[in-house]
Amino acid sequence: MRGIILAGGSGTRLYPITMGISKQLLPVYDKPMIYYPLTTLMMAGIRDIQLITTPHDAPGFHRLLGDGAHLGVNISYATQDQPDGLAQAFVIGANHIGADSVALVLGDNIFYGPGLGTSLKRFQSISGGAIFAYWVANPSAYGVVEFGAEGMALSLEEKPVTPKSNYAVPGLYFYDNDVIEIARGLKKSARGEYEITEVNQVYLNQGRLAVEVLARGTAWLDTGTFDSLLDAADFVRTLERRQGLKVSIPEEVAWRMGWIDDEQLVQRARALVKSGYGNYLLELLERN
């Protein structure tokens, strides 16, 4: 399975901050926002990852992440010139996906929960599509899924004025290779975008879309506004201070997955030793 992180867009809801920097490079407490979706893919066992961003922001991501070798993964880059919709990621990333299945995660979405990585690994050999549902108070801001009495998905809508449920679809999607041709066959919506909801609708119509409600205790945070960005930082800060463990550290995930060894972890830690981040990496070895 290949992975794609979509980190494009102009971040207008965070202007003027994002007039000078990509939203996905902003800090969420003690690390760049992009680390959170990156570790989500890594915990799912995905090592071949393409990051899609704007031509203007691509150099910043490359400076931060490089080719991913220090994390035991392969990171490549592609650009989306205009924010023409989430589904365009599969057209842009077609060569990266090749004949494989693919997971798409949005660069401003944070997922946290017990056993999340183990749960996501189930989709490595997917046939069809798999998306998730999460109860929210303001579903009109998201794609929305409606469930029937037996828990089967009945309908999907993109940012409906009158939602049929409170279940939003978070920015994490798994598909088989058919998604490339499905995305290529889409037409722009009334909003002028190639909608991911339309991709999901095709799979739903074919009876090949699995919709799972995220397990109780799992947190999904969208960081697209000033308040939600601060809420996410507060959430991470509270978790880390109470537990003494950090959240969404790519080096830690790579080390625990066996993709980098102790010496590689030490080398990375030394480069960051002046911050608590580097010290935390060194403490991982002492604890184990």
UniProtKB/Swiss-Prot annotation:
Cofactor annotation remark: Binds 1 Mg(2+) ion per subunit.
Activity regulation comment: Phosphorylation by the serine/threonine-protein kinase PknB down-regulates thymidylyltransferase activity.
Residues annotated to bind dTTP: G8, G11, T12, R13, K23, Q24, Q80, G85, D108
Keyword Nucleotidyltransferase: yes
Record-level GO BP terms: dTDP-rhamnose biosynthetic process; dTTP metabolic process; glucose metabolic process; polysaccharide biosynthetic process
Effect seen on changing T54A: Small decrease in phosphorylation. Lack of phosphorylation
Reported modifications of this chain: Phosphorylated on Thr-12, Thr-54 and Thr-197 by PknB. Thr-12 is the primary phosphorylation site.
Sites where the protein binds Mg(2+): D108, D222
Modified residues (Phosphothreonine): T12, T54, T197
Gene Ontology annotations for the cellular component aspect, listed alphabetically: peptidoglycan-based cell wall; plasma membrane
Obligatory cofactor(s): Mg(2+)
Assembly information from the UniProt record: Homotetramer.
This protein's name: Glucose-1-phosphate thymidylyltransferase
Species per Swiss-Prot/TrEMBL record: Mycobacterium tuberculosis (strain ATCC 25618 / H37Rv)
